[in-house]
A protein has these predicted regions:
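Small-residue (primarily alanine) positions within well-ordered alpha-helices
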Residues: 22, 26-29, 39, 65, ...
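Short cysteine clusters
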Residues: 69, 91-94, 98
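Immediate flanking context of iron-sulfur cluster ligation sites
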Residues: 77-89
Length: 158
């Protein structure tokens, strides 16, 4: 697992721009009273789809940000050249989707609020880049303070 956000050059410009898209989706979810996890899917730096967690808004326990993003991408001939950007480390469900669709690279905004399954992904050959983006951390902290009950009934209670 690499921490591009901590290397001398920082993350690539395309990674920053696509994480910005995921962060916009996460902010939209928080504005709706939902869990602020956003995701973007890209191929060769081109945005394919974006989505955000809608578990609270839709009352759907599997409407995670990464799953919503994949749903919004629709049918694709292949995901093998794509990168998934997510503001928060993916859970087991979303990590499973990454493996199912053979997405080779995942860029994670932050893993402080929730560690997720990053080691599981890397053990399966997925390149994981952890940006440790302070904006993603701040958004999750705001959510945890405003909606502690929702956080505890979701991944915060695990």
């Amino acid at each position: 697992m690499s921490s591009e956000g901590m290397s001398s050059g920082g993350p690539a410009a395309a990674d920053r721009a696509l994480m910005d898209v995921a962060l916009e989706r996460a902010s939209a979810s928080l504005a709706e009273g939902g869990i602020p996890v956003g995701a973007a899917l890209a191929e060769d730096g081109r945005l394919v789809a974006a989505g955000h967690n809608e578990r609270v808004q839709r009352g759907d326990p599997i409407a995670h940000g990464e799953i919503a993003c994949l749903r919004n991408a629709g049918r694709q001939p292949s995901y093998r050249a794509m990168t998934l950007y997510t503001t928060l480390s993916p859970c087991q469900l979303c990590s499973g989707a990454v493996l199912l669709f053979q997405i080779p690279r995942v860029v994670v905004g932050e893993a402080r609020s929730f560690a997720g399954d990053l080691d599981f992904l890397t053990s399966r050959g997925v390149e994981v880049v952890l940006l440790d983006d302070e904006r993603c951390v701040a958004l999750m902290r705001e959510f945890q303070q405003r909606f502690p009950q929702v956080w505890s009934e979701d991944i915060g209670g695990r």
